[in-house]
């Protein structure tokens, strides 16, 4: 009997010697079911200090200390899109996640990152989609009869049914079954009046017909320009989507079509190194078993348990691969012999095209060299794509460390199912941006760990929108406190200073907690929790202590420092714009960043002495940069709002006529604006205000960095306070009791409310009264808060319409119904980034690192499992 001793050694049993090689290969595979030892990169002492930054590394399934090869310089490659269709929120989740980490490395930890992104513009999916688009267009031009269309749909149904037999993914299988049911139902559906039945069928069964046509005529396609046209179109769409999401462009953007010669040379070298072979068709395959049996190498480093998973391997090969010519089912294509109807390039092995996996290896290696600091992509790419990348690259270079840190973003699910094009359950980025801003979408992702599975739902959206509202409200208050402090400074010798409780120490403590959270694998969720705590502390210890007739310069300092710190962090995360206040670093003094320690004397939040000149700069505390268009519009529309107000009150008696005339005179004197004759030229109103107050012109201010915020906004803010002062005067008169006519009072109160709630809102201006009727009757001079706030936010802030509430209820019911579709046994199976082992019921038993789950964790999961059983039972009952 041949006895295996480990590491390829056997007892020498003669009668089993012929099988030694086979058994050796088998047992080697069994040995390699756990991840190999990972060696921490060695830091060069000459490169200076580095932060104790840990990143969750898929090569070890743990958080590892991040040490780049070259000091501060980080070499990073990210798998880009295969450009055959529009991008969806699953893509957004991945690219926003890595955009945030990249920003943190550069703007917080002071690393220099070379970020390379590829465009996969040669792929089976692109080939098939381009051919189908071409064939379906020709099909419609030929004006097929009804019998032909019905017959082609029937063929499409049969093709889907044949796919179902071999499909192992439960979600895809469920989708394919539902698609068969839909198409069968479609064939018996009568279109609406006057709608052509042929066009109706083609429109609603386009994919099925296109698949039928491709099977029959795809090989006849000779115009290879269609592949280029499709790829360039969707590449452009992708780049526009990324810009819409505020994602920083890559340092280097590479395309597969630009690397054909380099790919051929790369493949040839792998063949020369003995790890690939040429098949009779002219395709070149990677010899997985040869690689796995090499003492230097290890196949499937990321997902060792997937070695031999032919279903996943086949999915990585694409739909158009040649079957039956590999030495082993584990082997994968480096170069594919092109068949009729496919693009091709000449190579030593005949006409062909690159395999999917080799493309990334060649492009990354060409730009970044033989070892990458970071490689990243979605968790669904772990195996086979990324494991195959690692294998072929290490076979090319002859070493075992092509990537030091592999980062994988978690799945984005919708109703518990992975969002994907194959399941037709995706939401495009552009559709998402129709209902939510790019800032809100980014906040959705920041409120969750970048590597965890997260569900896109009504609740996650509400959390992000709610947090954005908190930020806007907080910064609005901080800004107004600066203006109040400016007012109090004019009487600072006569006013008592509000007691200070050393809020700065609280701020410093939060700064260090944020630093620790970002060192913990860029834990943005904890950082946002810190921001929430800080805002709550500021509310109770700063905002609540603002009192009339008190000098609040120290409180204003604390409010400004807090707002600035939050804005600096959010700027780094890509949430806040690069305003004057948001500039600078939020890293605490004494902390380590790439290159050394932040000096102890360094003020991470530099505070100036509270004086009147400082508050103009401090007053623009906002997530948004200030634009010329926004200033022009707000000034002009606020003038229109004021004109409506004075027209409403001027005829309410001599008292109010005198108030209006006095007010109009002061506005004319201070700002050169005639309230009874507001100019139609919107820009001219603002230019007039700037000229009258001896300020630089609008065009001159826009040429100065942050000139609109520092020079123009303080003038506009003073103007807005002047403009609303007439409303304050009217409210004081009403509170004095001097107006006895109840109808007159009603009209005046309505005019005041309209000014605040309708006309100023339409101007994008938020006016918040702080003085109550009692305060006004006592003669207390309590200035209202005012500022520019997005009109959509103001409208939604006043009230949620009944229609909106109904829509929300419908969405929740829809999500609940869709969630019930998943059997409880499959509820956790897609969460491979959280769990590594499951029992026969589908319940997780071990976490992603292979450790057994605690009793408390199992108890929580059991509750979720039982709840899903009930939802699934309800779902099944609804289908009866």
Language model: regions and residue ranges:
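Residue-level detector of well-ordered alpha-helical segments, enriched
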Residues: 230, 262, 266, 280, ...
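Short glycine/proline-rich turn/loop motifs
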Residues: 79-80, 214-221, 338-346, 511-514, ...
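Basic, alpha-helical terminal appendages of large translation-related enzymes
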Residues: 2-6, 10, 19-63, 69, ...
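Catalytic adenosine-cofactor/nucleotide-binding cores of aminoacyl-tRNA synthetases and other
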Residues: 166-167, 171-176, 181, 185-193, ...
């Amino acid at each position: 009997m041949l006895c295996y001793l480990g590491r390829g050694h056997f007892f020498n049993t003669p009668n089993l010697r012929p099988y030694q090689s086979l058994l050796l290969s088998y047992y080697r595979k069994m040995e390699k079911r756990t991840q190999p030892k990972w060696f921490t990169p060695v830091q060069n002492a000459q490169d200076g200090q580095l932060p104790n930054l840990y990143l969750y590394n898929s090569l070890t399934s743990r958080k590892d200390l991040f040490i780049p090869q070259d000091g501060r310089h980080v070499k990073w490659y990210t798998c880009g899109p295969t450009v055959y269709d529009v991008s969806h929120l699953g893509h957004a989740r991945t690219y926003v996640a890595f955009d945030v980490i990249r920003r943190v490395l550069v703007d917080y930890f002071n690393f220099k990152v070379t970020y390379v992104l590829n465009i996969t513009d040669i792929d089976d999916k692109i080939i098939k989609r381009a051919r189908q688009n071409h064939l379906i267009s020709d099909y419609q031009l030929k004006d097929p009869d009804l019998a032909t269309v019905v017959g082609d749909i029937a063929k499409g149904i049969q093709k889907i049914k044949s796919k179902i037999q071999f499909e192992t993914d439960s979600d895809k299988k469920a989708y394919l079954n539902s698609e068969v049911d839909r198409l069968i139902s479609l064939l018996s559906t009568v279109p609406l009046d006057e709608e052509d039945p042929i066009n109706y069928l083609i429109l609603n069964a386009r994919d099925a017909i296109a698949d039928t046509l491709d099977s029959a005529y795809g090989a006849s396609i000779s115009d290879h320009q269609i592949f280029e046209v499709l790829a360039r179109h969707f590449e452009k769409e992708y780049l526009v989507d990324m810009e819409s999401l505020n994602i920083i462009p890559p340092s280097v953007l590479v395309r597969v079509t630009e690397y054909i010669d380099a790919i051929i040379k790369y493949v040839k070298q792998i063949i020369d190194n003995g790890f690939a072979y040429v098949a009779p068709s002219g395709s070149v395959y990677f010899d997985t078993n040869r690689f796995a049996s090499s003492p230097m190498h290890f196949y499937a480093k990321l997902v060792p348990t997937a070695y031999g998973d032919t279903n996943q391997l086949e999915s990585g090969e694409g739909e158009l691969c040649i079957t039956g010519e590999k030495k082993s089912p584990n082997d994968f294509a480096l170069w594919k012999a092109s068949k009729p109807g496919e693009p091709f390039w000449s190579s030593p092995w005949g006409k062909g095209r690159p395999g999917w996996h080799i493309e990334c290896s060649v492009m990354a290696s060409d730009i970044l060299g033989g070892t990458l600091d970071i490689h990243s992509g979605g968790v669904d790419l772990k195996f086979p794509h990324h494991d195959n990348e690692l294998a072929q690259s290490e076979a090319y270079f002859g070493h075992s460390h092509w990537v030091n840190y592999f980062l994988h973003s978690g799945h984005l699910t919708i109703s518990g199912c992975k969002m994907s094009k194959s399941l037709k359950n995706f939401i495009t980025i552009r559709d998402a941006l129709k209902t939510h801003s790019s800032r809100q979408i980014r906040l959705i992702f920041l409120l969750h760990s970048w590597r965890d599975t997260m569900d896109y739902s009504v609740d996650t959206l509400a959390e992000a929108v709610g947090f954005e509202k908190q930020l806007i409200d907080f910064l609005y208050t901080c800004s107004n406190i600066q203006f109040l402090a400016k007012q109090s400074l004019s009487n600072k010798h006569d006013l008592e200073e509000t007691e200070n409780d050393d809020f700065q120490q609280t701020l410093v403590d939060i700064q260090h907690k944020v630093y620790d959270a970002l060192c913990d694998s860029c834990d943005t969720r904890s950082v946002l929790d810190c921001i929430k705590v800080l805002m709550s502390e500021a509310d109770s210890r700063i905002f609540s202590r603002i009192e009339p007739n008190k000098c609040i310069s120290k409180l204003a300092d604390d409010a400004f420092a807090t707002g600035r710190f939050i804005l600096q962090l959010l700027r780094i995360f890509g949430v806040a714009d690069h305003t004057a206040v948001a500039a600078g670093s939020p890293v605490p003094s004494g902390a380590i960043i790439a290159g050394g320690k932040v000096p102890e004397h360094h003020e991470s939040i530099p505070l100036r002495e509270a004086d009147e000149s400082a508050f103009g700069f401090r007053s623009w505390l906002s997530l948004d940069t200030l634009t010329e268009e926004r200033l022009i519009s707000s000034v002009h529309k606020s003038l229109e709002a004021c004109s409506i107000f004075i027209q409403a009150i001027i005829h309410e008696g001599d008292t109010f006529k005198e108030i209006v005339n006095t007010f109009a005179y002061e506005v004319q004197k201070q700002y050169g604006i005639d309230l009874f004759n507001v100019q139609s030229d919107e820009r001219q109103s603002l230019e007039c205000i700037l000229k009258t107050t001896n300020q630089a012109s609008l065009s001159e201010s826009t040429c100065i960095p942050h000139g609109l915020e520092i020079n123009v906004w303080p003038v506009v803010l003073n103007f807005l306070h002047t403009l609303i002062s007439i409303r304050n005067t009217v409210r004081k008169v009403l509170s004095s009791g001097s107006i006895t006519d109840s109808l007159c009072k009603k009209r005046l109160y309505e005019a005041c409310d309209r000014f605040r709630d309708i006309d100023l809102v339409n101007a994008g201006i938020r006016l918040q009264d702080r003085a109550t009727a009692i305060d006004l009757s006592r003669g207390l001079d309590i200035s209202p808060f005012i500022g520019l706030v997005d009109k959509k936010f103001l409208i939604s802030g006043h009230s949620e319409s009944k229609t909106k509430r109904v829509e929300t209820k419908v969405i929740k019911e829809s999500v609940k119904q869709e969630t019930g579709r998943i059997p409880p046994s499959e509820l956790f199976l897609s969460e491979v980034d959280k769990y590594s082992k499951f029992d026969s019921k589908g319940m997780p038993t071990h976490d992603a690192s292979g450790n057994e789950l605690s009793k408390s964790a199992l108890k929580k999961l059991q509750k979720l499992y039982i709840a899903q059983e009930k939802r699934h039972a309800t779902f099944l009952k609804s289908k009866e």
